Amino acid sequence: MSNKNDSFVVFDRVQKSYDGLSLVVKDLNLHIKKGEFLTMLGPSGSGKTTCLLMLAGFETATHGEILLDGKPINNIPPHKRGIGMVFQNYALFPHMTVGENLSFPLEVRKISKHDREKKVMQALEMVQMSDFINRKPAQLSGGQQQRIALARSLVFNPDLVLMDEPLGALDKQLREHMQYEIKNLHKQLGVTVVYVTHDQSEALTMSDRVAVFNDGQIQQLSTPDGLYERPENAFVAQFIGENNKLAGQIKSVNNREVIVKTSQNMEVKALKVNCGDVGTDTTLSIRPERIHLNSKYINKVDATIKQLIYHGDHIRCLIKIDKDNDFIVKIPNSNIKSTLKIGEKIPISWDTMDCHALDA
């Protein structure tokens, strides 16, 4: 987590309730560094968008304080916070040209006509849209409209830009392209970005750090690789990427490792991450690409192939390891496809360090 001394955005014990009874955000403490790209990731209703709206000034915190560059902003209206915003629906004025859309936030800030024209052109050049300055939004594609919305959020040189699921309406290929464009702009400008999405691939691709939300709380705050490789609880392991899980009970504990007995009496050696003592229930988490089609590693079992699905760069293999559990295995695409057959029995194994013992 960021040191408090270099924090640009701070949520200090922030709570939010809409009905005065239930909390949709629960005691949120979060420090975001200047120039950082932080993503709030989580399912619908997890509290992530409410946090963004409180930071923007469109919602008020029920309790706690939000600070921007060291100053409390709870009572400052949205238009005086100096924050750029990008929405999923673009929110462009349909009766204005592209140039007029970008000029509007500068007019509100009493920028001179000469400086407005200069800043508008600079912003359009950043997103490679200067040739479209005289077009109306209806004459643009979805991707072009999103670029204009992005340029408008940056045109007045804000220190902080908030993005609320900005790529949700785009098709897959364009969405992936825009992810890289936004990340490159962030690097180029050094602006602080707080990004909200439920799409894990967006979060992992673009972010410096990701805050995973569920039930109004941050479940884990980490770098993208930290979330994927070292999930701290069963929710994060299941929400980030694909995950195989086994339920069991802890049989023994030895420093950082545990032996877990599953419901089918299989004993599994795992890394102790977030679990209790001997006799308590736990959930084991193993990523599909960490399972090997051999008996080389300490955790091994014979499995039966149920399904083979071709994915281009890899083959997705669904296997049954016992009467209660199926696993997914990702196999790099090679000639192995022709050697595997549905119904075939194969040995599989995985390393202790790739198997995490988490909360039940």
Please state what every model-predicted region is.
Residues 41-43:
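The feature captures the beta-strand-to-loop junction immediately N-terminal to the Walker
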Residues 78-84, 88, 92-235:
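ABC ATPase nucleotide-binding domains
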Residues 56:
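Helix-to-loop junction immediately C-terminal to a conserved catalytic motif
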Residues 2-11, 16-27, 76-77:
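A short, flexible loop at the N-terminus of ABC-type nucleotide-binding domains that lies
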Residues 64-72:
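Conserved ABC transporter NBD signature motif
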Residues 62-65, 115, 215, 247:
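Conserved coupling/switch loops of ABC nucleotide-binding domains, chiefly the family-specific signature
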